[in-house]
Amino acid sequence: DSNTSTITVTVTSVNDVPVAADKSVTTAEDTAVTVTMSATDVESDALTYSIVATPDNGSLGTVSGSDVVYTPNTNYNGSDTFTYKVTDANSGVSNIATVTMTITAVNDAPVTSNGTATTNEDTPVNIALTATDVDGDSLTYSVVTSPSSGSVSIDGSVATYTPSANTNGSDTFTFKVSDGTADSNTSTITVTVTSVNDVPVAA
């Protein structure tokens, strides 16, 4: 038999790129949330996170470490996505990972507006009340404070103001609306009642 020889094999290190993970995050409408992105690296290299594609229905703050703040667009609810990648200390670049955002709906209170109207003494006037609701809910109108020199009734979104007999000048009433869940602000309607000459009555 021959002598025994030794073969020395040198295995050179090859950088393994990090692996970025997909994420799912939920937040409420009009509520920002911090998203923590994640990745693994077998060599435990320091990792740098960067955004690849920004969301369509929200915005992202500046990436801080593995965190980024997602802010949904005003009154938006539904789904949104953005993507990110990770670079290790040896310039290895990960796959592109997707963050799927779910933005849950939150009821928005309706908003009313002040208004004005003019009518003649002893003459009722119809006034279209103004309110908006970003959720498109059905609205119910109601009087909050009645006028001091007349009366008011509401049918749908139309108020009928009737001045007291032989009164003139300025009068006000207030109203609000409800979407079935939330009440609006209270708005004021100012009514100007113009004087009308009353014919004399013979005794």
Region roles according to the model:
Residues 86-88, 177-179:
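Conserved structural position at the C-terminal beta-strand
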Residues 31-36, 77-83, 123-128, 168-174:
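Short, solvent-exposed loop/turn segments enriched in Ser/Thr/Gly
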Residues 18-31, 52-56, 110-123, 144-148, ...:
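Short, solvent-exposed loop/edge segments of extracellular or virion-exposed proteins
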Residues 71-77, 162-168:
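Short, surface-exposed loop/turn segments at beta-strand-coil junctions that are enriched for proline
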Residues 34-71, 103, 114, 124-162:
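Surface-exposed or secretory-pathway low-complexity segments enriched in glycine-proline
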Residues 15-19, 47, 58, 75, ...:
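Proline-centered linker/hinge motifs at extracellular inter-domain junctions
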